[in-house]
């Protein structure tokens, strides 16, 4: 998945490899299936990635974002 600044993504679900504890943490931060997030900034080497949901602003590693099933949303 190529995350670039000023792109929007919709969460469709979670990967089967995600641990229940980490899944619960993401859910508590508002990363719910059906919700969307915007990519704010990408670090110079591509990792980590700054995203914003309706509730919070997060900085996640690529490997953590890979645990989310997402689809691009047209702005």
UniProtKB/Swiss-Prot annotation:
Localisation: Cytoplasm
SUPFAM superfamilies, per the entry: C-terminal domain of transcriptional repressors (SSF50037)
Entry-linked Gene3D superfamilies: 2.30.30.90
Domain of life: Bacteria
One GO MF term: transition metal ion binding
GO annotation, biological process: DNA damage response; iron ion transport
Keyword check for Cytoplasm: yes
Consequence of gene loss (knockout): Reduced uptake of Fe(2+).
Keywords: Cytoplasm, Ion transport, Iron, Iron transport, Transport
A GO CC term assigned to this protein in UniProt: cytoplasm
Induction: Induced by hydroxyurea.
Major localization class: cytoplasm
Pfam families: FeoA
Keyword Acyltransferase: no
NCBIfam families, per database record: PRK09555.1
Protein family per UniProt: Belongs to the FeoA family.
Function according to Swiss-Prot or TrEMBL: Involved in Fe(2+) ion uptake. Does not stimulate the GTPase activity of the N-terminus of FeoB (residues 1-276).
Quaternary structure note: Monomer.
Full protein name: Fe(2+) transport protein A
Gene source species: Escherichia coli (strain K12)
């Amino acid at each position: 998945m190529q995350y670039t600044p000023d792109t929007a993504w919709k969460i469709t679900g979670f990967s089967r490899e995600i641990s229940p504890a980490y899944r619960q943490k993401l859910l508590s931060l508002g990363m719910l299936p059906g919700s969307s997030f915007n990519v704010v900034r990408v670090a110079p080497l591509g990792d980590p990635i700054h995203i914003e949901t309706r509730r919070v602003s997060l900085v996640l590693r690529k490997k953590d974002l890979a645990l989310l099933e997402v689809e691009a949303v047209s702005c």
